[in-house]
Amino acid sequence: MYAYIRGKLTQLFPTHVVVESINGVGYEIQTPNSYRFQKYLEKELVIYTSLIVREDAQLLYGFINEEEKDMFLSLIKVTGIGPKSALAILATSTPNEVKMAIENENDAYLTKFPGIGKKTARQIVLDLKGKVQITRETTETLLSMNEENSNSENLVKEALLALEALGYSKREISKVEKVLNKSTFDSVDEAVKLGLKTLVS
């Protein structure tokens, strides 16, 4: 229904962003690692969207490019994979990394994500192998956010909230917190990326 939304990014939360369209409507959009959009705060952007209608809600999901959106739509067709699990996978990996894991039948890689057990990882491979095309990485896919003059301690707190929203356990987050507290960051996205890297390593 909504292929994409163009507007100003007005708010950023651990699980979602708010984009105000040209007609003044604010769209709440669920995203994988919302802090990747941090540099667009109060700026205009295009976010590629998919509307999912459930009995109790209509939810918009948003992505940095069409490739990421297509990967999300492929993942949620797999039995046992809901939107939250698909977002958690894409928060940590580029679409190409997921596709390579599928094509190489790398179940171990897929089970590193919250909510993905051995059975579900095998189902992803069975359902999607041969149906996903590995493409050349774009700069959009590898979007890097840099915000200057931010307080590292607050950035770590926000990063931990983002990881919790993705479904990681308190024990896993506690492990990440120790790593993040030893580092300094210029943006929440930078802290989230290190946290995700720690969790899947």
From Swiss-Prot:
Q: Which domain of life is it from?
A: Bacteria
**Annotated keywords:** Cytoplasm, DNA damage, DNA recombination, DNA repair, DNA-binding
User: Which residue stretches belong to region Domain I?
Assistant: 1-64
Keyword Cytoplasm listed? The answer is yes
Q: Which residues form the signal peptide?
A: none
* Cellular localization per UniProt: Cytoplasm
Identify the stretch(es) annotated as Flexible linker. Answer: 144-150
Cellular component GO terms, alphabetical: cytoplasm; Holliday junction helicase complex; Holliday junction resolvase complex
Q: Where is this region: Domain II?
A: 65-143
- Its primary localisation, in coarse terms, equals cytoplasm
Q: Which InterPro entries match?
A: DNA_helicase_Holl-junc_RuvA_I, Hlx-hairpin-Hlx_DNA-bd_motif, NA-bd_OB-fold, RuvA, RuvA_2-like, RuvA_C, RuvA_C_sf
Which biological process terms from the Gene Ontology are attached to this UniProt entry? DNA recombination; DNA repair
The job of this chain, per UniProt, is described as: The RuvA-RuvB-RuvC complex processes Holliday junction (HJ) DNA during genetic recombination and DNA repair, while the RuvA-RuvB complex plays an important role in the rescue of blocked DNA replication forks via replication fork reversal (RFR). RuvA specifically binds to HJ cruciform DNA, conferring on it an open structure. The RuvB hexamer acts as an ATP-dependent pump, pulling dsDNA into and through the RuvAB complex. HJ branch migration allows RuvC to scan DNA until it finds its consensus sequence, where it cleaves and resolves the cruciform DNA.
Q: What is known of its domains?
A: Has three domains with a flexible linker between the domains II and III and assumes an 'L' shape. Domain III is highly mobile and contacts RuvB.
Matches recorded under HAMAP family? DNA_HJ_migration_RuvA (MF_00031)
Please state what the protein is called. Holliday junction branch migration complex subunit RuvA
Give the taxonomic lineage as stored in the record: Bacteria, Bacillati, Bacillota, Bacilli, Bacillales
Q: Which gene encodes it?
A: ruvA
